[in-house]
């Protein structure tokens, strides 16, 4: 884990400038969630509008919304593909994102252009540098 001030950045993940993370699993699917920075900026998360299974998403488009006591924030897809699973646990316990932002994934995507799109994402070290610039 890399620490940037009060924020934690998990190594081995890919990151966007909008503070989403992507974890490539052994089977080639991708888990998506929001970063420690994002959950701290949002405050206590009250509701996660999970995407529909079967939804086709494009990198950079809205995947779902996360509602906190402060604001409603859009979560963008870090990769393109089909949503094949969602973390139903977040329907009942959205605060899990606050408790464990890198464990509480939101959706699993079957990517359709992974190799190219990963080149456009940041690794943990680059994302940590990006956080320092904010």
Curated annotation (Swiss-Prot):
Keyword Hydrolase found: no
Lipoyl-binding domain residues: 29-110
Any one Gene Ontology BP term: glycine decarboxylation via glycine cleavage system
Cofactor(s) it depends on: (R)-lipoate
GO terms under cellular component: cytoplasm; glycine cleavage complex
Domain of life: Archaea
Residues with the N6-lipoyllysine modification: 70
S-S pairs: none
InterPro entries: 2-oxoA_DH_lipoyl-BS, Biotin_lipoyl, GCV_H, GCV_H/Fam206, GCV_H_sub, Single_hybrid_motif
One Pfam family from the record: GCV_H
Keyword terms, alphabetized: Lipoyl
Cofactor binding description: Binds 1 lipoyl cofactor covalently.
Keyword DNA-binding appears in the UniProt entry: no
Protein family according to the UniProt entry: Belongs to the GcvH family.
Subunit annotation: The glycine cleavage system is composed of four proteins: P, T, L and H.
HAMAP family: GcvH (MF_00272)
PANTHER family attached to this UniProt entry: GLYCINE CLEAVAGE SYSTEM H PROTEIN, GLYCINE CLEAVAGE SYSTEM H PROTEIN-RELATED
Role, per record: The glycine cleavage system catalyzes the degradation of glycine. The H protein shuttles the methylamine group of glycine from the P protein to the T protein.
Annotated protein name in UniProt: Probable glycine cleavage system H protein
GN (gene name): gcvH
